[in-house]
């Protein structure tokens, strides 16, 4: 049974510490990590300005995962030894999975901010919760978008990864009943120019980038855009690479008109609007959905910690009791079939792209 009643609380005293995981250096997607950390830090500031955790200041203990699962698992061990009340964050799915497995083994609450891989743990766990929607939900919506645009012959440029393989499987399973096919192009064996040859040979109408950014995503886009045989070819990036300013800086107009997934609602909540303004000031650029995920993560944990007294067991038992007004809507966790962690079932999903006429502006193409 969940422990939804407040535990014994002791006002004042030493800081309540939360471990924060984020990719802050290469080969991690450091731009995403910077946005995630900005959201986490802003929320901590707001929590402390409002009195902290029953008078105790909230403090982040940040660790750079650098897209390395082993480094993430080691960080979770270290943070547990430092006495953190919970661990939060992470962007890369495979890294988050390593962190989740270790947190589960240690009995340490982990609120995953951004990673979408369905199977964060092999077995159901009471210790882990997640804000981002599972990959199966988001990528099915993306497949539906492709079908609505008339695409049935899809090519995916892919690299070895559980995350990319899982995404390709979701796409294939969703497209197959409608006669759609998915051809995988192994980027270990192909140059960007060779990708263009494969696309022409397979008569694909859409190429999806299931690869890292900037390499090899950027040179693939540049090659496809310049190949006359592929005029009109749709390029897609379901993992969200075009969300960040670095994409536009690298590709300019070539990076526009590439649909991707992001996790924002049509309208932010009043809290979200205020937070968005503060994040823009902090980042000196428009905040991505990842920054809002970071903020919501701390907002949820602060509410849980106020009632649990920073006790790890009570914190984990409180996931089903969460009722927080986040930046993107009301947040509650439930058990979702096929998902091993506590899941926010109402996380918003959009398919968007950068407007070719104005690459700094996003167009919403589909919601779900």
Q: What are these regions, as identified by a protein language model?
A:
Residues 1-368:
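Extracytosolic ligand-binding ectodomains
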